[in-house]
Amino acid sequence: MAGSKKSNRREEILQALAHMLESAEGASRITTAKLAQQVGVSEAALYRHFPSKARMFEGLIEFIEEALMSRINRILDEEKDTLERIRLVLQLLLAFAERNPGLTRIMSGHALMFENERLRDRINQLFERIETQLRQILRERKLREGKSFPVEEKILAAQLLGQVEGSLNRFVRSDFKYQPTENFEEYWALLSAQIK
C-alpha cells in the first residue's frame, strides 16, 4: 500500500511539472519551490520521491521516449508501405506534441536550457533514435518496393525530422497557439511530392 501511494505521488509530481511547463510559468525556469507549491507539499517531500529536479525531468523524458517509440514500433508492425509509414510517424510526433504542450517544451529543448546538460543529451538521443528509425524506413523501401529515392536516405531523414522539429519550436514559440497538426495533409502532400 505504501509503495502504491509513493508511486501515485511520483506521478502527481510529474503531472504537476508537465502542467507547469504548459502554463506561462513554463516559459521561465521552474523551481522546486514553485513545483512543491503546485503539488501542495514541501520541497523536502519532493526530494523523498526524486533525488533531484533533473530526475523529475528524466521521468518526463522517459514517458516521452516510451510513448513515442512504442507507437513508432506499432506503426512499423502494422504498416508496410514506406510513404505511409513516414506519414504516420510524422503525424504521430506532431499530434503527440499538440496533445502534450508541456512535454513539447522538453522535446524542443526550451525547458532544459538551464537544466543539467545530461537532460539535453537525453532529448538529443531520442531525436537521433527517431531519425535513425526514419532512415531505416527509407532504406527498406528498396527491399520492400524495389524503388529508391532520388536523394540519399540520410539527407531525407534529416529533412523530415527537421520539419517536425521546426513545427515543435513554432508551437512553443507561439505559446501553443499554432497547432502542429494544422494543415498536416497539405504539409504531407508537399513533403511526399519532394521525396517520391
From Swiss-Prot:
Residues 7-68 form the HTH tetR-type domain. Disulfide bonds: none annotated. GO terms for cellular component: bacterial nucleoid; cytoplasm. Its main location: cytoplasm. Keywords: Cell cycle, Cell division, Coiled coil, Cytoplasm, DNA-binding. GO terms for molecular function: DNA-binding transcription factor activity; transcription cis-regulatory region binding. It comes from the Bacteria. One of its GO terms (biological process) is negative regulation of division septum assembly. Gene3D superfamilies: Tetracycline Repressor, domain 2 (1.10.357.10). Pfam families: SlmA-like_C (PF22276), TetR_N (PF00440). Residues 31-50 bind DNA. Homodimer. Interacts with FtsZ. This is Nucleoid occlusion factor SlmA. It comes from Vibrio vulnificus (strain YJ016). The gene is slmA.
